[in-house]
Each structure stands twice: as C-alpha cells, then as structure tokens.
C-alpha cells in the first residue's frame, strides 16, 4: 500500500461538517465514497475537522491506496468524482499522518457589516463589530498556551484542552465590493468550535458588551461569559503547516 497526501478545498455550505455523518453528508463521506468507487478501501485522515458550514481552502488528508496507483493517475480519476463542491488541489505520495504530523493550523474568518448580495451569504458572515483596535486588543489575550475548556463546545474525542495560539490578529480589506474584517488565528490545534467562540468573544468586546476582564476570566476557566459561537459561514481552514 502507498500513503498519499491530498490537499483539498471544499465548500462547507454543502456539507454537515468534515466528519462522517449518518446521512452520508460529511466531507469525509464524499471522499471515502469516491475512493471506494475506484476500488480503494481506506479511512481518510484530516488535519482538522470542521463544523457544519465551515469551509476549507487547504485541508490536508492522508490515506492509503494499492501500489498500482501513482499520484498522477489517482489525481486524474479522483478529482472529477469530488467536484464541484470539493476540489482536489494537489496529490502526492508521502508517508505521513495528516493529523499527528501537523505542527500548526491557520484559520481565517470573514465578517462584514452589510452584505449586498445573498449569493455571498454562505461565505462571508454578516454582523456588527467595533473598532479594529479593540478587536486586536481582545485577540492578543488568547496568544500563548491556555486551557481552552471554556472555549469549546461539547463533543469530540479530544481529552486534553491545552492549546497554543501562536498568533491572532484582525485587519480590514475589501472582498467583492464588501468592506470586511478578516480574523487570522494560528495555533497548534483547536478544540471543537474554539475558533468561533474566540472570535465571538472578541466581537462582543469590540462592541463593549463584555469586558476584557470577562474574557480573561473565561480563558482562566473562572467563568464562562461567551457560550454561543459566532456563525459558521465566515470561517475557513486556511492552511496547515508541517
């Protein structure tokens, strides 16, 4: 058997998250079904699992296939079976584990105050936010190593809540005629819905609805003020570092 590394992008609006679902509407379901159609029976490992509605620009996968499959041949037959909502960007033979060998994961979140067309609604979140300075002040609180027990949703197999945030910042830009704030958070790994809870806390602070002290108390597991994640549609798994 050969081990392959696949880099994919997918439109999270068409799936119920990355993980396999009882109704077969997970990204993993689609990929494993496509592989099965080619006679390849292999579990597919992802660098990170994304929730319902969350997108990926560069998700990384590892799986095994029989030795008669070369990377070029497999790309040729697999890519059309994943389209149009999953795009196979790159495929190479590599002996590695997509999840355990990953060193960092980078997420981006797109938020605008005024969405001018419904056709971008699945891809840019729409909601109010305060000044960029306040957003970045809040984001800085999360850098470093923390126990993120109060910044996660229930579920998932992870038992260790400690994670490292290497960098977290926000900036403004224009995307298809929309002024957006873009959040970028880079960490070693993330708990379930942790990125969206972090961004929600920062947005609420920028709107002066919560204090910096309340964010710090939640980081230190003293009191949970933010319990509801920000909407999923603006979030992208942007890059995985190995």
From Swiss-Prot:
One of its GO terms (molecular function) is RNA binding. CDD domains: PseudoU_synth_EcTruA. It catalyses: uridine(38/39/40) in tRNA = pseudouridine(38/39/40) in tRNA. It is an enzyme of class 5 (isomerase). The active site is at 51 (nucleophile). InterPro entries: PsdUridine_synth_cat_dom_sf, PsdUridine_synth_TruA, PsdUridine_synth_TruA_a/b_dom, PsdUridine_synth_TruA_C, TruA/RsuA/RluB/E/F_N. Its EC number is 5.4.99.12. One of its GO terms (biological process) is tRNA pseudouridine synthesis. Belongs to the tRNA pseudouridine synthase TruA family. This is tRNA pseudouridine synthase A. The lineage of its organism: Bacteria, Pseudomonadati, Campylobacterota, Epsilonproteobacteria, Campylobacterales. The gene is truA.
């Amino acid at each position: 058997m050969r081990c392959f590394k696949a880099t994919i992008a997918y439109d999270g609006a068409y799936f119920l998250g990355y993980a396999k679902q009882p109704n077969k509407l997970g990204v993993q379901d689609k990929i494993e079904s496509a592989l099965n159609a080619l006679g390849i029976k292999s579990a597919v490992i992802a660098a990170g699992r994304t929730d319902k509605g969350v997108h990926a620009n560069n998700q990384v996968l590892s799986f095994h296939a029989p030795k008669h499959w070369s990377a070029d041949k497999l790309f040729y037959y697999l890519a059309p079976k994943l389209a149009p909502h999953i795009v196979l960007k790159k495929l190479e033979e590599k002996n590695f584990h997509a999840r355990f060998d990953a060193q960092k994961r980078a997420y981006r979140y797109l938020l605008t105050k005024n969405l001018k067309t419904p056709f971008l609604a699945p891809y840019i979140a729409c909601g109010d936010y305060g000044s960029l300075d306040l957003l970045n002040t809040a984001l800085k609180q999360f850098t470093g190593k923390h126990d993120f027990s109060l910044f996660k949703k229930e579920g998932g197999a992870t038992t260790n809540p400690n994670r490292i945030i290497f960098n977290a910042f926000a900036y403004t830009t224009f995307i298809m005629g929309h002024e957006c704030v873009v959040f970028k958070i880079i960490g070693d790994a993330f708990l379930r819905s942790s990125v969206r809870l972090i961004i929600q806390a920062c947005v609420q602070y920028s709107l002066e609805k919560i204090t910096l002290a309340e964010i710090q108390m939640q980081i230190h597991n003293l009191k949970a003020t933010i319990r509801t994640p920000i909407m999923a549609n603006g979030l992208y798994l942007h890059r995985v570092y190995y």
